[in-house]
A protein has these predicted regions:
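Glycine-rich FAD pyrophosphate-binding loop
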Residues: 24-43
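N-terminal FAD cofactor-binding segment of flavoenzymes
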Residues: 42-80
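N-terminal Rossmann-fold NAD(P) dinucleotide-binding loop
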Residues: 16-17
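Predominantly flavin-linked oxidoreductase catalytic cores and closely associated redox partners
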Residues: 113-260
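Beta1/beta-strand and adjacent pyrophosphate-binding region of the FAD-binding site
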Residues: 2-13
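C-terminal helical "tail/cap" subdomain of flavin- and related membrane-associated enzymes
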Residues: 324-485
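Short beta-strand to alpha-helix junction loop
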Residues: 92-112, 237-244
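FAD/FMN-dependent oxidoreductases across multiple families
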Residues: 237, 241-322, 327-350, 355-356
Length: 485
């Protein structure tokens, strides 16, 4: 391995590979250190429609399409007494679509694409420590996990895309805040011989609410379906204390939900069950001098709306654009970092409001759609709530633009919203895990209005964050808006 590089990327998942591809194409020397060997298994199979635009930007869409993944034209929700579908398009008439993917396959495609665009990728290399000049990281020590060989590499800029491990956030900054309400356990397996019901759009994900959480059902191109359960950690722990095994909990929940039981009545579970914690968190800052934190390394949200891949890749696009323009002296590093951190956190918080609406303050689907309408800025008229909901959860809303000029007001309101849902450690012990009070519900609506005043990931001069917006042509970077806030 070389002793120095322009850009060091920790992690080769979607955030890391997206940033690596874009920066390598801009002529930077890019080194990716990935602790696993791809292909490797990963959860997060359901992609929003915005993924197609990312694949186009990366120049990898043909490779993704040729893999044969299921095209996802929307989703079907059954939550308490209500049910509805979100439809982005249709195979016969066209329109927007995402994908239902095997992540081991997709992530491998994206990382190999980074290589083909000039990035140097090393696997299985883990970063054991970072070296700093004040607050600025400038070098990393690494270990090759197979041989135990060690070494170091210096860099100009760091992109921490290390996933939930979060090298910067957990080891150095220690600035993660966990959401006390969204602390769940996810467990899942893969089935063959199933029969899907004739509901929802083509290739839809099924999101099915249960008393202590929800099911996902995702059709995959390899002839299997992914059937998973996300369950409140306390409910899960109570079942375990009563002597139920993971397998017993999984199968009993399936048997208790008629739709899922019918889907699997003649099916065979062809894998072992897998599980992991789904504890939502947000970082107080997503960047600092010489570094950007992208994807799950910065923020993780309950997977209810399938936003993980979307947030990871869009944060990577903006981080790459900021680094490109900083390096060309087009923008100041400090203002670019501030714009990046604000834009990414607000993207996260907008989805968090919708998830909170489902989990904590459920008064029927119209309540959910109204929250979406408040946060949508795509000229959705009053009452067209389902359209607003579709715009946001497809990820297309984020593509339109990233902000308007009222950033100072939004930033202060966003901080208040963060304090409500992600208390600092000193407050956690005092926070009961209960639904929001009427006062807190009213506050949340105020915070939603604050989010409503700011678009995400600006791509026009009229919609800039801190006066900056992302451009992808003729070169990737960020430009300054002449518009006065």
């Amino acid at each position: 391995m070389q002793s120095s590089t322009d850009i060091l990327v920790i992690g080769g998942g979607p955030a890391g590979s997206t940033a690596a591809t874009l920066l390598a194409r801009e002529g930077f020397s890019v080194t990716v250190l990935e602790r696993e060997v791809f292909p490797r298994e990963h959860i997060g199979e359901s992609l929003l429609a915005s993924a197609v635009r990312i694949f186009d930007l990366l120049g990898v869409r043909d490779k993704v399409e040729s893999a044969g993944f299921v095209r996802k034209y929307g989703g079907y929700f059954a939550w308490r007494e209500d049910s509805w579908e979100t439809k982005w398009g249709d195979p016969a008439t066209g329109g927007q679509y995402g994908f239902q993917v095997v992540r081991s396959q997709l992530d491998h495609i994206l990382l190999e694409h980074s290589k083909s665009n000039g990035a140097s990728v090393f696997q299985p290399y883990e970063v054991t420590s970072l070296e700093f000049d004040g607050e600025r990281p400038h070098a990393a020590l690494w270990r090759e996990r197979n041989t135990g060989n060690t070494g170091g590499i210096s860099f100009r800029y760091l992109i921490d895309a290390s996933g939930r491990a979060g090298v910067m956030t957990t080891k150095y900054l220690k600035n993660r805040r966990f959401n006390e309400s969204f602390q769940n356990i996810a467990f899942w397996g893969y089935w063959r011989g199933f029969k899907l019901p004739n509901i929802g759009p083509s290739g839809a994900i099924l999101i099915l609410g249960i008393p202590d959480g929800w099911f996902w059902v995702i059709p995959l191109h390899n002839g299997t379906i992914s059937v998973g359960i996300v369950m409140n950690k306390n409910a899960f722990a109570a079942k375990r204390r009563m002597g139920a095994s993971l397998q017993e909990i999984y199968h009993s929940e399936i048997a208790a939900f008629p739709m899922v039981a019918e889907i699997l009545v003649k099916a065979e579970l062809v894998t072992d069950l897998q599980s992991e914690q789904d504890f939502s968190y947000i970082s107080e800052e997503c960047g600092g001098p010489g570094y950007f934190i992208a994807g799950d390394a910065a923020c993780f949200l309950d997977p209810l709306l399938s936003t993980g891949f979307h947030l990871a890749t869009y944060s990577a696009v903006m981080a790459a654009a900021c680094i490109a323009s900083i390096s060309r002296n087009e923008v100041d590093e400090k203002e670019a970092l501030e714009a990046y951190s604000i834009a990414y956190r607000q993207a996260y918080l907008r989805y968090m409001v919708l998830v909170a609406t489902l989990y904590q303050n459920w008064f029927g689907k119209e309540s959910l759609f109204q929250e979406a309408q408040r946060m949508s800025l795509l000229n959705v008229s009053s009452g067209e709530f389902i359209s607003a909901f579709n715009n946001i959860i497809s990820g297309i809303e984020d593509m339109q633009d990233m902000g308007d000029g009222r950033i100072r007001f939004v930033f202060s309101e966003m901080n208040r919203m963060t304090e409500t849902h992600f208390p600092k450690a000193s407050k956690r012990a005092r926070m009961a895990q209960e639904p929001l009070s009427p006062t807190e519900q009213a506050q949340r609506k105020v915070y939603a209005e604050a989010v409503n005043s700011c678009h995400l990931f600006a791509n026009t001069p009229e919609s800039a964050v801190n006066g900056l917006f992302v451009r992808t042509t003729p070169r990737l970077g960020v430009s300054r808006s002449e518009r006065t806030p």
